[in-house]
Each structure stands twice: as structure tokens, then as C-alpha cells.
């Protein structure tokens, strides 16, 4: 329990020392070797003890660490970052590639549309008394769409379509029988 508490305190102190240079908890902090951790100066703060206000003697290690920290310049040394930082990488890549839109291209003049509009208006002018075009016979046959030989006779909605268009074969048979009976009855009289 004591070791984890000191580790947390050392991480906090490390964070306070290097807050302007790098963040705690990045992948780079956990990947450093023991040599790099030993080179960092550790500042210690005096914390009030729970021994009732009595003065406590500091160990030689703490005094030497404070002396070393005092000897070093106050400006923290810049460490090379080793890790994955999304924000800093995108900023660097953006500065490497610069795209300027419209700066290199000369402005083109837009041609006037007045001559084209006049020719289009002349093509669709209905004021002229010209004779309408005649349809070719093939187009007329397709528009009528009557009979078995039309292109839609084999379509999905062409069930019961015969030579005479859509018809019911049973009714056609009954009509033919009635007409034959009528012809036979007329012949007998």
C-alpha cells in the first residue's frame, strides 16, 4: 500500500513539473526506461505530518534531492515525446501540406449567354406557321399498342393478350358459338 501511494505522489509531482511540456498518462510515460526516470529531478514538498506538530528529521536522500533540484535551472528540460498524441500529429501534418484554393488559377471570364438564348428561342419559337412533323409508321404502331406483335405483348401485365388486345378466351368462344347458332337458326328459317 505504501509503495502505490508513493508512486501516485511521484506521478503527481512529475505532472506538476512537466505540465507545460508533456502530459501524464501518455503512452510515452509508461514506455520510459529506468535510466530516464532516474535522470529526472524530483521536487519534494513538505507535507504536514500527523505527529502533532513536532519537527521531523528529513532523511539524507530527501535533502540531497532538494539540493540537486536547487542546483538545476528552474527551466525544465525538454524531453522528446514518445507516444501517440492525436492533436499534435495532425497539426504538424497540416503545416507540411499547404493547399491554396484559387490562388494559382487565373480568373476566367464568363462568356455571355445572349447569342445562345437567341438561338434557343428561335428553335422553340411557336409563332411560326410551320407544319408539324409526321410520325413514322413504326412509331404510330408502337403508340397504338394493340395486338400480339407489339413490344409490350410479352410484358408482365400482358396476360390474356391476344391478336385483338386484352380479351377473355372463354367469352370469345361463347360469342363465336352464339354467332354460329344464330347463323344456323337463320339458315333454317
Swiss-Prot record:
Residues 32-42 have a biased composition (Basic and acidic residues). Keywords: Acetylation, Cell cycle, Nucleus, Phosphoprotein, Ubl conjugation. Residues 48-58 have a biased composition (Low complexity). The modification Phosphoserine is found at residues 64, 88, 98, 130, 158. Pfam families: PCNP (PF15473). It comes from the Eukaryota. InterPro entries: PCNP. The modification Phosphothreonine is found at residue 150. Ubiquitinated; mediated by UHRF2 and leading to its subsequent proteasomal degradation. One of its GO terms (cellular component) is nucleus. Residues 150-160 have a biased composition (Polar residues). The modification N6-acetyllysine is found at residues 75, 161, 163. GO terms for biological process: proteasome-mediated ubiquitin-dependent protein catabolic process; protein ubiquitination. Residues 21-84, 145-169 are annotated as: Disordered. It is found in: Nucleus. Signal peptide: none annotated. Interacts with UHRF2/NIRF. May be involved in cell cycle regulation. This is PEST proteolytic signal-containing nuclear protein. It comes from Rattus norvegicus. The lineage of its organism: Eukaryota, Metazoa, Chordata, Craniata, Vertebrata.
Amino acid at each position: 500500500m505504501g509503495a502505490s501511494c508513493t508512486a501516485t505522489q511521484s506521478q503527481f509531482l512529475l505532472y506538476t513539473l512537466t505540465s507545460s511540456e508533456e502530459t501524464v498518462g501518455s503512452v510515452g510515460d509508461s514506455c520510459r526506461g529506468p535510466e530516464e526516470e532516474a535522470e529526472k529531478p524530483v521536487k519534494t514538498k513538505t507535507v504536514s505530518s500527523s505527529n502533532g506538530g513536532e519537527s521531523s528529521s528529513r532523511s539524507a536522500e530527501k535533502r540531497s534531492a532538494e539540493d540537486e533540484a536547487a542546483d538545476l535551472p528552474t527551466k525544465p528540460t525538454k524531453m522528446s515525446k514518445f507516444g501517440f498524441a492525436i492533436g499534435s500529429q495532425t497539426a504538424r501534418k497540416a503545416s507540411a501540406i499547404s493547399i491554396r484554393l484559387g490562388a494559382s488559377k487565373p480568373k476566367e471570364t464568363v462568356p455571355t449567354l445572349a447569342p445562345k438564348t437567341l438561338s434557343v428561342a428561335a428553335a422553340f419559337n411557336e409563332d411560326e406557321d410551320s407544319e408539324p412533323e409526321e410520325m413514322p409508321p413504326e412509331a404510330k404502331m408502337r403508340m397504338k399498342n394493340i395486338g400480339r406483335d407489339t413490344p409490350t405483348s410479352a410484358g408482365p401485365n400482358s396476360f390474356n393478350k391476344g391478336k385483338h388486345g386484352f380479351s377473355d378466351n372463354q367469352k370469345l368462344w361463347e360469342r363465336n358459338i352464339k354467332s354460329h347458332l344464330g347463323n344456323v337458326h337463320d339458315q333454317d328459317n
